[in-house]
């Protein structure tokens, strides 16, 4: 580090922080997904009515067991593509890109766009995560959230290694998760 360009060290630290963030994201989504026992079937992911039925069935299960409704829908990039491109029996998008030319959003059960992961299928906040092992929805916001994730980033740490006249650099932090109530979540299968 004594002879390193500060800009190159900054690049390395940024890459370590990104790797740390991906690892904690993967931990959180895997832990949440593994604890969910309720399921709702999407018969055909290309059929809009099947998505609508699965989302409402999941909402029914969550409401029946907890008296809450889902707030978020977590999907893989593959499920996001299937959901956003699903059509009704008239070949109209179920979740259209609002504001597109010649598309007034009639029949809109939410919206989606190919240039953003933002969307709101049936009013749910859409979260697209490549680390998700599968798609699910749940009551994930507010004081009664069913799943909690805590993280404290400690940042970079370095240790001199005299034997090699070098220095080891790492990025560290603490992460913990807690499934407070698995009945507030439903997996899509």
Predicted regions located by residue number:
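Alpha-helical scaffold segments that mediate packing/assembly in large oligomeric complexes
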Residues: 1-66, 187-189
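Short helix/loop capping segments that flank catalytic or ligand/cofactor-binding pockets
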Residues: 4, 82-85, 178-180
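Extended oligomerization regions of viral-like shell subunits
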Residues: 40-173
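Short intrinsically disordered coil segments
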Residues: 9-10, 88-90, 141, 183-189
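Short loop/turn segments at secondary-structure transitions that flank enzyme active sites
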Residues: 22, 26, 79-81, 175-177
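Extended hydrophobic packing segments that form well-structured cores
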Residues: 164-189
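Flexible, active-site-adjacent loop/turn segments at secondary-structure boundaries
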Residues: 1, 27, 34, 93, ...
């Amino acid at each position: 580090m004594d002879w390193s360009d500060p800009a190159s060290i900054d690049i390395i630290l940024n890459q370590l922080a990104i790797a740390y963030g991906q690892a904690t994201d993967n931990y959180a989504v895997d832990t949440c997904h593994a604890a969910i026992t309720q399921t709702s079937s999407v018969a055909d992911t290309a059929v809009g009515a099947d998505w609508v039925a699965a989302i409402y069935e999941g909402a029914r299960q969550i409401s029946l067991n907890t008296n809450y409704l889902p707030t978020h829908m977590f999907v893989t990039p593959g499920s996001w593509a299937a959901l956003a491109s699903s059509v009704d029996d008239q070949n109209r998008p179920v979740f259209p890109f609002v504001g597109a030319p010649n598309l007034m959003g009639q029949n809109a059960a939410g919206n989606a766009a190919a240039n953003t992961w933002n969307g709101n299928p049936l009013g749910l906040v859409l979260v697209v995560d490549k680390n998700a092992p599968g798609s699910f929805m749940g009551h994930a916001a507010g004081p009664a959230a069913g799943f909690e994730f805590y993280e404290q980033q400690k940042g970079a740490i370095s240790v001199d290694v005299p034997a090699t006249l070098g220095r080891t650099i790492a990025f560290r932090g603490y992460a913990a998760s807690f499934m407070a109530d698995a009945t507030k979540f439903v997996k899509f299968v």
